[in-house]
């Protein structure tokens, strides 16, 4: 939030047009190893237990990396128009706008990893209560992105996770 306020101040003071982007739970090939889906994958490969909080009933808006790239490309085509205060600042959410439960996500990931030959075992899951401070649901409202640029992310979860699983299989077989 502070970066959005700073962008607003710079735009107002110096006339610099600023566009902010909020990414929602990005996943895909070559992803960050500290993200949950990567951690789940590594645990499945090692046969370790996966912990699912709120008994797997937490919802996240998982967004495939190609959709993020397309969204960034679309937004780069045009600086924001001035708002009612004359400030040229706009913030867009880039997310799949279809949150799924963590339980469903892990089950789909497991299926894709099995199909790609990464695992052949059943993932062991531990269902735990909600952690203090955790958020039950996050999702992206992409209506402004769609209105201004005619774009909204649309990669189905299974398609994106299949691409990740195939990449993971190829990358880690070489190591």
Outline where the language-model segments fall.
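Short-chain dehydrogenase/reductase
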Residues: 1-4, 31-38, 62, 99
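Hydrophobic alpha-helical membrane-insertion segments
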Residues: 9, 31, 37, 69-70
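C-terminal substrate-binding subdomain of Rossmann-fold SDR/epimerase-dehydratase oxidoreductases
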Residues: 42-175
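Flexible, glycine-rich beta-alpha linker
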Residues: 16-36, 58-59
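Active-site Tyr-X1-5-Lys
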Residues: 1-19, 41, 45-46
């Amino acid at each position: 939030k502070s970066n959005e306020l700073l962008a607003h101040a710079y735009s107002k003071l110096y006339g610099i047009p600023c566009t902010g982007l909020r990414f929602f739970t990005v996943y895909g090939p070559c992803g960050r190893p500290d993200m949950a889906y990567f951690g789940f994958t590594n645990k499945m490969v090692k046969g370790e237990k996966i912990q699912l909080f709120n008994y797997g009933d937490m919802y996240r808006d998982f967004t495939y990396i190609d959709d993020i790239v397309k969204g960034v490309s679309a937004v780069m085509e045009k600086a924001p128009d001035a708002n009612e205060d004359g400030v040229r600042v706009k913030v867009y959410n880039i997310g799949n706008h279809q949150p799924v439960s963590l339980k469903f996500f892990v089950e789909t990931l497991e299926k894709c990893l099995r199909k790609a030959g990464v695992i052949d075992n059943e993932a062991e899951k531990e269902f735990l209560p909600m952690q203090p401070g955790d958020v039950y649901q996050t999702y992206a409202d992409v209506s402004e992105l769609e209105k201004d640029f005619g774009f909204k992310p649309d990669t189905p979860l299974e398609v994106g996770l299949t691409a990740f699983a195939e990449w993971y299989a190829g990358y880690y077989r070489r190591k």
